[in-house]
Amino acid sequence: MFYFTKYANQKFDILNKHKVYFRREQIEEAIKLPDEVKKKNKNYFAKKDGVGVVYRKGGEATKIITFYPVK
């Protein structure tokens, strides 16, 4: 199960204002099937298809902290 933080939910609108569009499914897929994953402390950094995602695993839920476009 994926949980988007308040900031992560706001990030969709922030990026839309800059004409950068992501769907929730893209963010979730970057975590499920990433091209690259790194870990620093408790946070994981996943990249896939032009999106980077910062998230944290906890029990059954994965908390999505933020996401951003990558080249």
Segments from the language model and where they lie:
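Ribonuclease/tRNase effector modules and their secretory precursors
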Residues: 1-71
